[in-house]
UniProtKB/Swiss-Prot annotation:
A GO-annotated cellular component: plasma membrane
Membrane topology reported for the UniProt record: Multi-pass membrane protein
Protein name per its UniProtKB record: UPF0391 membrane protein MADE_1011595
Native organism: Alteromonas mediterranea (strain DSM 17117 / CIP 110805 / LMG 28347 / Deep ecotype)
Entry's localization field: Cell membrane
Major place of residence: membrane
Pfam families: DUF1328
Length: 58
């Protein structure tokens, strides 16, 4: 149990360093960009599969 507590403490310290260091703002911008890129790729993939007449895999 003490091992888990130490592990989560270290993770919290690392998150605090990133959060207070200004990296979080840059990471948010990158995440938003990647989100829209992958949404566009999803739509393109769905359209391509619809034009080929294939049913989506379950």
């Amino acid at each position: 149990m003490l091992g888990w507590a130490i592990t989560f403490f270290i993770i919290a310290i690392i998150a605090a360093v990133f959060g207070f260091g200004g990296i979080a703002g840059a990471a948010t911008g990158i995440a938003q960009f990647l989100f829209f890129v992958f949404i566009a790729l999803l739509v393109i993939s769905l359209i391509a599969n619809a034009l080929r007449g294939r049913a989506p895999k379950a």
